[in-house]
A protein has these predicted regions:
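Non-heme Fe(II) oxygenase metal-center motifs and adjacent flexible, charged/small-residue loops
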Residues: 1-178
Length: 178
């Protein structure tokens, strides 16, 4: 992954979530804005998915002209609620694959500024990635060079049963339990 990322609600790090930036400076994660959680729920509903829990994670990725994201699955959440993805800025090639492997078959789709993609149900765990960004394709009125992607998820996590807050030293890297 060469995109730069920050998180709201829960901090994602490979294979887990935490309330602090465990693989960075240890700072607390900023709260998920209620309006952004509501956007996730409205998008999922408009796509025909009933979501009972609140969207409580936003992964905000910035892609410059050379950034990429390899094929991966959004599988660290305990919830099966759909993933909601909002694109702003430069167009990207979004590769949407299958649920078994990172390789073919997959479909390449251009995501443009303002596009909103919802994937849930059987496709919730499909491998997907961004093999390239198309520089200079952002709407000029946006004033943005590069691409911002806001990915909204429902964690299915609770504070209870998670690791205790450390007294000293680096925070625990263990993911919280459902």
């Amino acid at each position: 992954m060469t995109a730069r990322q920050f998180c709201l609600g829960w901090h994602w790090y490979p294979y887990g979530y935490a309330r602090t930036v465990v693989d960075g400076d240890g700072a607390p994660v900023k709260a998920m804005p209620p309006w952004l959680a509501a956007l996730g729920a409205a998008a999922a509903e408009a796509a025909g998915h009933a979501v009972e829990d609140t969207y409580d994670i936003a992964l905000v990725n910035f892609y410059d002209a050379d950034a990429r994201m390899g094929m991966h699955r959004d599988s660290d959440e305990k919830s099966s609620a759909p993933v909601v993805s909002l694109s702003l800025g430069d167009t990207c090639v979004f590769r949407f694959g299958n649920t078994r492997t990172r390789t073919k078959p997959y479909t390449d789709v251009e995501l443009r500024s303002g596009d909103l993609l919802v994937f849930g149900g059987p496709s919730r765990l499909a491998y997907h990635g961004v093999p390239r960004v198309l520089p200079g394709t952002a709407p000029p009125e946006l004033g943005l060079t590069g691409r911002l992607n806001v990915t909204l998820r429902v964690s299915g996590l609770t504070e209870e049963g998670g690791p205790p807050a450390p007294a000293d030293g680096p925070p625990s890297r263990a993911p919280l339990k459902p």
